[in-house]
């Protein structure tokens, strides 16, 4: 079982799309819940294609604000029950083991005076099914003062309303691995404010069904929210290793050696093998560029991952 949830703060930025692509490629999640897409349905269709997650439901943005999307693997059966600008509720059936459970992607109202409406929605959703339940998203609220540093103190009544709603829904916070806060913003000369606004709430029966699953906070440089990655510790070991796809990096063109590497590889490709000449040359270029990249720049993806963990 694996899922990704992210308040991306808009998918109009190519770097944001690439960050999401990278996470989906690495984790191969059953579900991807995206908050604040800031896109209409037709624009999200392009994103779905890039993520190789064609099945899905899109709640379009309103005047370039908000917008939700729930995407899933083709092999997973997902029956969407209800949706709104603040949630997508679905029943999930995993193909390989026929386990059925409930997923709700949730987006709490960003306006404090409308937060009670969000909790009423959450409580209403809790009455609709007895299936094992995972409710994941950006709730725009904290449970207690320990989930915030910097800025003004949060009113106790505001936090208590959230806690009481969670309790009435028979849900509990499942904890996390990683940084203590999922959202941050600089307040000018007053420093930073950091809060844990994003989380996963689960029912006891969901924990029983997935006792090994843990929530990870993953830093993302293109949004002020962390990405939430839900996965089992052994998930990476169970994945079958596939041949790595060759990708030409645009940054190579900025290095003068790149042209020389390609030229030498192309000439070498003309003199070896018995395949189609063009295929021989392309294969040799791929091998030479991959080797040159490793020696010249190192493992860029690994470096990015290491820096994200440090953040």
Please name every model-derived segment:
Residues 1-311:
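A shared catalytic/ligand-binding motif for oxyanion handling
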């Amino acid at each position: 079982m694996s899922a990704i949830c992210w308040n991306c703060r808009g998918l109009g930025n190519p770097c944001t799309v690439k960050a999401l692509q990278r996470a989906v490629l690495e984790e191969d999640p059953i579900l991807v819940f995206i908050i604040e897409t800031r896109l209409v349905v037709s624009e999200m269709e392009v994103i779905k294609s890039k993520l190789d997650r064609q099945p899905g439901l899109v709640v379009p943005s309103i005047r370039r604000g908000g917008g939700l999307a729930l995407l899933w693997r083709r092999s997973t059966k997902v029956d969407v029950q209800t949706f709104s600008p603040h949630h997508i509720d679905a029943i999930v059936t995993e193909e390989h083991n026929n386990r059925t459970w409930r997923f709700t992607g949730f987006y709490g109202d960003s306006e404090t005076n409308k937060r009670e409406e969000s909790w009423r929605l959450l409580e209403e959703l809790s009455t609709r099914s007895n299936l094992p339940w995972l409710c994941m998203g950006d709730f725009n609220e904290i449970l207690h003062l320990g989930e915030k540093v910097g800025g003004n103190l949060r009113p106790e009544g505001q936090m208590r309303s959230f806690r009481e709603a969670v309790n009435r829904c028979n849900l509990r916070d499942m904890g996390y691995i990683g940084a203590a806060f999922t959202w941050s913003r600089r307040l000018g000369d007053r420093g930073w404010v950091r809060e844990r606004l994003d989380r996963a709430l689960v029912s006891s029966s969901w924990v029983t069904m997935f006792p090994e699953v843990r929530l990870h906070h993953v830093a993302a440089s293109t949004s002020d929210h962390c990405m939430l990655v839900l996965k089992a510790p052994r998930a990476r070991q169970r994945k079958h290793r596939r041949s790595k796809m060759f990708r030409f990096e645009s940054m190579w063109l900025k290095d003068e050696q790149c042209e020389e590497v390609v030229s030498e590889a192309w000439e070498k490709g003309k003199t070896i093998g018995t395949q189609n000449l063009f295929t021989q040359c392309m294969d040799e270029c791929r091998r030479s560029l991959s080797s040159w990249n490793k020696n010249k720049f190192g493992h860029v993806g690994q470096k990015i991952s290491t820096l994200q963990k440090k953040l």
